[in-house]
Structure formats: structure tokens, C-alpha cells
């Protein structure tokens, strides 16, 4: 009988250990660290290379929790809440996020199957611009993004690029002629901040406003309407960010598709676990446990 009780006690302890371990693993996976991500493209080189495997912490800016999968399947919008993290995103942080568009460029529709890795070069409340190839933010003297790539861009002209690479968001030659060398200034909305609306700047913020309200913006007789309501100003509900790849000559980023809603963010890339050259399959020993800066 004593032996039976001893075996039963051991089995219960083992089951409790397994349950606790699985629980901790779920908590770790959901709230702290994303699964290892393999990098397929060169858009963030030299900081992150194609073939790198990276670790991403969700503690910056905080884990994202989905509210109701049934709801977003019905109305097309992903409903999320952001838990408090250890700190907010800072300029030059390298972040992983869900791509904010899914097939249709006229509306934001978070693609849960597509992950992007880019560097944050402008925060909510910043005003971002590119002046002769150099990234700038109002009242910020720090270098933003990959400085030596931007210096290379200063020496090049429109003739060196195809129109697809040269022309930028919002892709409207009538009101804006922004390009990869001269862009902005573009105000990056912060939650609670308001802007005035007219036909011209509606082009910059149309997708953001429609994403937040789930209603359509339109223009009638030179006036801006949200559904049937005249709109002179708009107060943003979410924070937004300007994301850019370090390899500025080969990166699909905010220069082309606009600002990133905060609810698309997954977390901050912290280090490379290991790396293989995709062309040769050889292990890159120099990139083993390499901090991402």
C-alpha cells in the first residue's frame, strides 16, 4: 500500500511538473518572446542579413493580445489590446510587425501571415522628412537609420532609379512629388493628437482614419466628409510609426506604403541566434549570438 501511494505521489508530481512547464512555456511564448524568426530578405542589411535567425522580445512595447477572433473575421478588422511593457519603442529600434496591408492598398488590413522587420525612424508626434537623402526628425540630432547608405543616396539622382523605386507615398503627383531623396515633412500621428483636414492632407491620413473609424472618407465640393458627416479636424485614437529598412535601395517600407499602426507591432528584435548564408548554406560563425543594433 505504501509503495502504491509512493508511486501515485510520484505520478502526481510528474503531471504537475508537466502542466506547470507547459503553462510557463505558454506564458513565455504569448507574453515575452516570439518564436525564432528567419530573415528571407536583404532589406535590413547590414544590421540584419538574409539567413539570420532572430529573437524578438514582446516586452517592448508590450505583448499584444487578441480580443475576439470571431469579431475580426466578421468585420475584417483585428481587435487587439496592448499589455504594458518594460518601455516604449525608441527611435532606431529594430522591430518586427505584421504588414498593415493585405492585397488592397486603399485600406489598412493587418496581414497576420506576413511579418516585416524594419527600423523605427520616427515616433508618434514626430515630423519626419528626407532631405537630399538624409533622414531627419524635428528636434532630433541623432543619426536615424543607416547613415552610410543615406550618404550614398545623396550622390545619386533620379536617373539612377526606376520610377517604382524613386516615387514614394502617397503616390500622388498632383499634390505631392515625394521621392526617396526628398520626402515630407510628414507628421506622424500620436494618440489623442488632432489635425486639420483638407483635400491635400487627406491623402496622407485617409487610410489611418478609415482604419480607426471603419468608415469611408470622401470629398464633395472641396469639403472632406467621413461617411455623411463634414470633417474639419480629426483626433487620432492610435499611435503610428515611420519604419525604414537600412538597405534603403532595396526595402519596401513606410516611404512607399505609409505609416504603421501600433497594433501591428509584435516586438523588438534583440539578437541573432545563428545565421546561414542562403546562397551557400554555410554557417556564419561571426553572426552567432550577435546583438542587433
Label each PLM-derived region with a short phrase.
Residues 36-46:
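N-terminal signal-anchor transmembrane helix
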Amino acid at each position: 500500500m505504501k509503495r502504491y501511494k509512493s508511486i501515485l505521489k510520484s505520478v502526481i508530481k510528474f503531471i504537475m511538473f508537466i502542466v506547470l512547464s507547459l503553462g510557463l512555456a505558454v506564458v513565455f511564448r504569448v507574453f515575452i518572446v516570439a518564436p525564432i524568426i528567419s530573415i528571407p530578405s536583404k532589406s535590413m542589411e547590414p544590421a540584419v542579413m538574409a539567413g539570420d535567425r532572430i529573437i524578438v522580445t514582446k516586452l517592448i512595447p508590450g505583448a499584444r493580445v487578441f480580443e475576439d477572433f470571431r469579431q475580426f473575421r466578421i468585420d475584417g478588422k483585428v481587435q487587439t489590446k496592448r499589455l504594458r511593457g518594460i518601455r516604449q519603442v525608441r527611435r532606431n529600434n529594430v522591430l518586427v510587425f505584421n504588414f498593415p496591408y493585405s492585397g488592397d492598398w486603399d485600406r489598412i488590413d493587418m496581414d497576420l501571415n506576413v511579418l516585416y522587420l524594419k527600423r523605427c525612424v520616427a515616433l508618434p508626434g514626430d515630423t519626419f522628412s528626407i532631405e537630399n537623402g538624409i533622414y531627419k526628425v524635428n528636434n532630433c540630432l541623432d543619426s536615424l537609420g543607416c547613415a552610410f547608405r543615406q550618404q550614398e543616396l545623396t550622390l545619386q539622382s533620379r536617373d539612377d532609379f526606376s520610377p517604382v523605386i524613386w516615387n514614394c507615398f502617397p503616390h500622388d503627383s498632383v499634390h505631392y512629388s515625394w521621392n526617396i531623396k526628398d520626402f515630407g515633412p510628414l507628421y506622424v500621428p500620436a494618440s489623442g493628437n488632432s489635425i486639420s483636414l483638407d483635400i491635400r492632407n487627406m491623402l496622407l491620413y485617409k487610410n489611418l482614419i478609415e482604419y480607426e473609424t471603419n468608415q469611408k472618407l470622401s470629398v464633395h465640393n472641396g469639403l472632406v466628409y467621413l461617411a455623411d458627416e463634414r470633417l474639419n479636424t480629426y483626433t487620432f485614437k492610435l499611435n503610428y510609426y515611420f519604419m525604414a529598412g537600412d538597405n534603403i535601395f532595396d526595402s519596401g517600407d513606410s516611404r512607399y506604403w505609409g505609416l504603421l499602426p501600433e497594433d501591428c507591432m509584435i516586438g523588438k528584435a534583440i539578437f541573432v541566434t545563428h545565421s546561414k548564408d542562403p546562397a551557400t548554406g554555410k554557417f556564419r560563425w561571426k553572426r552567432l549570438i550577435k546583438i542587433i543594433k
